[in-house]
Amino acid sequence: MENTSLRSCRKDGVVYARGATDDKGQLLTHLLAAEAWMKTIGDIPLNLIYLIEGEEEIGSPHLEEFILEHREKLQADVVVISDTSQFGPEMPALCYALRGLTYMEFIVTGANQDLHSGMFGGIVPNPNQVVAAIVAEMKGLDGRIRIPGFYDGVKPPEGWEVAEYEKLPWNDSDLAAQLGLPGLSGEKEYPAPVRRWYRPTLDVNGMYGGYAGKGAKTVIPSIAGAKVSMRLVSGQNPERVAELFEAFVRERVPDDCKVEVIRYQNSPAIIIPVDHPAMQAAKVAFRNGFGKEPLLIREGASIPIVAFFVDTMKMPSILFGFGLPDDNPHAPNEKFTLADFHRGIATSAHFMDVYSEAAG
C-alpha cells in the first residue's frame, strides 16, 4: 500500500504513517504500558523517566548537552531504547550490539575555477579523477578495505554468537531477490550475518564534482569530493580510524591539488552483556509478550546516544525492537503492524514487572 500523504491511515491491521515504526509507534508502546499498569494494577514498581527528543535523524546535536545539564534527574539504573526491529514476522529479537560510525568527507581542489577541457586538458589536474582514484583504492571489489590498520582490533564472533546467528532463518538468495540483486556482495570468506553485524564496512555515500546535468559540458572541475561512512565493530577506535582514513587520503592527493578532510561523526560500537539482569528480564518479558523466546541478534547500524549512555553516563542500555525490517522507515508508506504494537505494549509491561523484582 502507498500512503503518500502526511496523514495516518489504517488498513488490514496495519497503521501507515510517518514515524509509525521509527520511532513514534515504538515509543508509544512504553507510554501505553505504563498507562495500562496504572489503570489496572496501580502504582508502577519502578521510577520511570521518559526522555523524548526529535533530532535523532540529524545526529541529536543537542541531546548529550541536555542530558549532562540534567544529569542528576536523568541518572537511572538502566536505559530502554526502542529503535531496532524484530528479525522478521513472528521472530522477536533482542539486540545486544550495535556497530559504531565514523563519517568523513574529503574535498579535492585543483584550479581556482572550472576549466574548458579542450583548452586546459592535459596540463591541469582533474579533481574528479583524483577523488575517483582514491575512492577506488580504499576498498576492493572483493569487499576488503585497503586502508592500512583499518582492521586492527577486529575480533571474530565468539562461539555462542555463532550458535545464535546459525539459529536464524537466514537465506542469502531470498534477501538478494528482495533487494533486486543477483546475489549478496562483500567478503565472501565470511557468512552474510557476520559481514552484516560483526565486520566493519566502508561505503561511499556520495560523490560530487563537475557537470552531471543533461547533455554535454566539457568541463574540468575546480573541486570534487566524496562522503564516506565507516561502520565499526568492537575493538576499533573511531578516532584512530578517522586518523587512518585522513592519512590514507592525504598521502594520495598529488602535489598540484589541495585537500580538505572533514570529520562529521565518531561513535564507538557497543556490546551489551547478555547476562546483565536487565537483558535477562527483557528475555522473560519478550517470552511473555510475544509468546516465544526472543532471538539474540546484533544490529549493523549505529545509535550514537547508546554509546553516550553506556560510556559517559555509565547506564547499561537495552534495545527493544517491536517493528519489522520491512516497515519502510522514512518512506511515505512507513508502517507498524497493530499486532506487534499490542505485543510491544505487553512486553514493556512485563519488563517493568520482571525487572522490578530482579532489581529488588
What are these regions (language model features)?
Residues 45-126:
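Histidine/acidic-residue-rich, glycine-tolerant segments that coordinate divalent metal ions
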Residues 18-25, 57-58, 93-94, 119-122, ...:
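Alpha-helix capping and helix-loop boundary segments enriched in small/acidic/polar residues
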Residues 65, 121-142:
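A short core secondary-structure module
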Residues 32-39, 133-137, 230, 350-353:
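Short glycine/serine- and small hydrophobic-enriched flexible loop segments
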Residues 15-17, 112-118, 213-214, 329-331:
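Short small-residue beta-strand/loop micro-motif enriched in glycine and branched aliphatics
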Residues 1-49, 343:
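Active-site metal-coordination/substrate-binding segment of hydrolases
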Residues 88-89, 146-223, 231-244, 252, ...:
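An extended, acidic, His-containing surface patch that forms the Zn2+-binding/catalytic region
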Residues 105-109, 137, 207, 227-231:
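Residue-level recognition of well-ordered beta-strand positions that form the cores
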